[in-house]
Amino acid sequence: MAADKQAKLSLQEDSIAKMLICKAHIGTKNVEHKMRPYVFKSTSEGIHLINLAKTWEKILMAARVIVAIENPADVLVISARPYGSRAVLKFSQYVGAQAIAGRWTPGMLTNQITQKFMEPRLLIVTDPRTDAQAVRESAYANVPVIALCDTDSPLEHVDICIPCNNKGKESIALMYWLLAREVLYLRGELPSRSVPWDVMVDMFLWRDPEEFERKERLEDEEAAPHTAQADATQWGADAAAADWKQAGADWTGPAAGGAGGEWDQSAVAAEGEWGGGRPGVAVGEPW
């Protein structure tokens, strides 16, 4: 019986592969003394690697805490780091929690006069260092905190830390995806952990809006020469000749002069006093 429970809670190969691909195990060169138990080993370059088995254990523990809260809206997920903004929004969408992506307004948990005052029962932060203001206010309001912690993250006022790489956009997206999947499984909305979830990890991945604009601009620039070439091919040789012929059909040249090429006075007067206004040129003289 105990072996079956251990097998159900054990880390699956698919989840391990996802963590390795998203580089969730790569830490930093600095290690907080409270984060040392979660470090597996360090590379020759001095980068500490995180034990993914303990990461999975903390994800299971955090999911059980989230499920224990009756109202999902009492769970607040925040991320001041831009890479985690899309992940927290997607997590709140599938789990039903509240999300704040962006700058944290001071006093949201402590100042009751503000319009944005909130009273959550659980706080989930992407980085306890960048979200330090929210973690500090949660300690004043007696709100438990779940945090994605790197090897150099401070664990002060953090109740449950999920050791992972909280600086990469792929790792942050995967951590929230795994946490959301586990919450839905414990609620009974997913039949089993082995059954693939129809929501992909890419839905939680942060995308740069400037990159989309850059791609659209390049696509427009590539399509512009083809459009100009297509318009140019519509004008064939026959169409151009017909157009020139039609444009020159109504044109008539000026009245021809005499055989000797001389201009008479009447012709000059009809043309608007040609030669009369020029000094040194007599009317009727040849040019």
Swiss-Prot record:
A Pfam family it matches: Ribosomal_S2
Entry keyword set: Cytoplasm, Ribonucleoprotein, Ribosomal protein
Compartments where located: Cytoplasm
Gene3D superfamilies: Glucose-6-phosphate isomerase like protein, domain 1 (3.40.50.10490)
CDD domains documented for this protein: RPS2
Region feature (Disordered): 216-243
Molecular-function annotations in GO: structural constituent of ribosome
GO cellular component: cytosolic small ribosomal subunit
Annotated Low complexity bias: 227-243
GO biological process: ribosomal small subunit assembly; translation
Main location: cytoplasm
PROSITE patterns: RIBOSOMAL_S2_1 (PS00962), RIBOSOMAL_S2_2 (PS00963)
Subunit details: Component of the small ribosomal subunit. Mature ribosomes consist of a small (40S) and a large (60S) subunit. The 40S subunit contains about 33 different proteins and 1 molecule of RNA (18S). The 60S subunit contains about 49 different proteins and 3 molecules of RNA (25S, 5.8S and 5S). Interacts with ribosomal protein S21.
Biological function: Required for the assembly and/or stability of the 40S ribosomal subunit. Required for the processing of the 20S rRNA-precursor to mature 18S rRNA in a late step of the maturation of 40S ribosomal subunits.
HAMAP family: Ribosomal_S2_euk
Family: Belongs to the universal ribosomal protein uS2 family.
Protein's recorded name: Small ribosomal subunit protein uS2
